[in-house]
Swiss-Prot record:
GO biological processes: threonine biosynthetic process; transcriptional attenuation by ribosome
Record's compositionally biased regions (Low complexity): 7-22
The keyword Amino-acid biosynthesis belongs to this UniProt entry's keyword annotation: yes
Cited function: This protein is involved in control of the biosynthesis of threonine.
Chain intervals for the UniProt region annotation (Disordered): 1-22
Record protein name field: thr operon leader peptide
HAMAP family cross-referenced by the UniProt entry: Leader_Thr
NCBIfam families for this protein: thr_lead_pep
Domain of life: Bacteria
Amino acid sequence: MRNISLTTTIITTTDTTGNGAG
C-alpha cells in the first residue's frame, strides 16, 4: 500500500507542475 501512496504522490506532484507550467 505504501508503494501506491508514493506513486500517487509522484503523479500528483507531476500533474501540479505540468498544470502550473501549462
